[in-house]
Amino acid sequence: MVANSPSDGAVDLYVLMDDGTIATTEIKNAVLAACNDDTVRPLTDKVSVKDPQKVSYNITFTYYVPKDSSLSSTEIKAAVDKAVAEFVAWQCGKLGRDINPSVLTGKLMQTGIKRVALTSPVFTTLRDGSDDTTPQVASVGTITATNGGYEDE
């Protein structure tokens, strides 16, 4: 959660769930009820619970497998899919976390592939709300992973 004060007497709360999703209305109402209680907030403050701004990104890459790999193409694909899922979960797990393709490349290279040609995402700075602006959260769009085949070392 991020709290900021865009103007005097106003407090905006931005809630992100543990899995990186935007909070449901039920959760936002519970947060508002807890933070808007007269015993918790200053009398003149107006508390609001708002959604962070989603910044959509796509993942597109081609990966290449070493010809002498001991892993089958099915095993490599499963490892690549798992690495992408881990990246997506990490990427949306915190408000203001920059979209960082280097992290994706690192995760992919640990799967046993030889190399990856990453087309998207590109590095994108996201706002964390610390400057009293609406915080942003990354939201994955399409994922296109292409096996480019085998290559010699």
Model-derived regions: residue spans:
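Carbohydrate-recognition loop of C-type lectin domains
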Residues: 1-97
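An aromatic-glycine-centered, glycine-rich loop/turn in mixed alpha/beta architecture
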Residues: 77-153
